[in-house]
Amino acid sequence: TAPASHAQNLPAAEGTCALPAHVADTELPAPDPQLAQLLRFATGAGVRVAVIDTGVAPNPQLRRLIPGVDLVDPESPDPFFDCDSHGTVVAGVIAGASRGVAPDAEILSIRQTSMRARQPGPQGDAGSLQTLADAVHFALDQRARVINVSVVSCLPPRLAGRVDMGPIRAALARAEAEGALVVSAAGNASESCEPGYTVVPAHEPTVLAVGARDGDHSIAAYSMPVPGPFVSAPGLVEAALASDGSGWASGTAGRPGRKDAVQPYLGTSFAAPAVSGAAALLIQRYPHLSPAQLRALIHAAAQPGGAAVDPLAAVAQLPPATVAPRQPAVTIEPARESAAPARWLRLV
């Protein structure tokens, strides 16, 4: 698996961490005016959101950051180490104090993959579908109600039928049964992830898949298509939490050969957490919502055309008793001896 950020699909020297391109407070764009209206309904208080990603670095903007587990480096675990400058950005979209959708939500950091500081686990499987399943189980053990997955595995048709999907489907079925909504990035189109490929977990029936849209509200060209219902959110984060401990960043700096370049935080990775934040608000208002009801409410609040999620419309909807969602069928496939090994996840 790898993060679903358009910017992070770039090679980096092993052990070289991404450098946030800092932005002064005076240079920040104005916050979304809708955020103030959202907070009149809910703030995410009491809702735990698991961020399965590259780790989440502490930042003063993350007031309720909880250490989870480090599946990348189990010998020297640090779920707060974000070498990729990815998971921290995701967490900030969800629960940043000034600009997050659900600023009072708890963030549970689960470090599951890294493109820059990968240190294989005992089985050499850090960042695999197996550790993704393990991460979901850990999130459920820690009572997360929303699980944000901005890392995906993109399987070409020739491999999709050979990969053992049993463990991840079992984890997703448990999440559905225990009342946790799984939100996933739809994935970014690239040479290694083309339309027609299977994107895991975004293409699973109980997962709320989120595509990215551009500033004009159209679906971004890089956003992978989803075979079933989906929603969309902005794919660009102009004011992100810096992963080096404080302040804001507009992207990562210091790409090889272009040290002065700034690669923006752009991709379906950063669209998914906006929806996870909206889900946290809904759960605070209606704690007994099932994942199926949450999906139905969020879909109902999406605007026609590009399925753009309107968090304010979602949170201000009528009580969920008026919602009658269709329950997706979930089939757990047993492991097969001929199954191919799980593919690495990618940052999207």
Predicted segments, located by residue:
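Extracellular S/T/G-rich loop segment that most often corresponds to the catalytic His/Ser-adjacent loop
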Residues: D53, A202-Q284
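Solvent-exposed loop/turn segments at secondary-structure junctions
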Residues: T54-P58, L71-V72, T113-A117, V152-P157, ...
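Protease zymogen maturation seam
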Residues: A2-G46, P60-Q61
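Substrate-binding/access-modulating region of protease and related hydrolase catalytic domains
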Residues: R116-V200, Y265-L266, F270
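Subtilisin-like serine protease catalytic core
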Residues: Q37-V49, T54-P67, P77-S128, P225-G228, ...
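C-terminal subdomain of the subtilisin-like protease fold in secreted/lumenal serine endopeptidases
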Residues: N148, Y286-V348
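Loop/turn elements at helix/coil->beta-strand transitions in domains of secreted/extracellular proteins
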Residues: A45-V49, P103-I107, D141-I147, A177-V182, ...
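Second-shell loop/turn segments in exported
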Residues: L38, E75-F81, P120-A126, R158-G166, ...
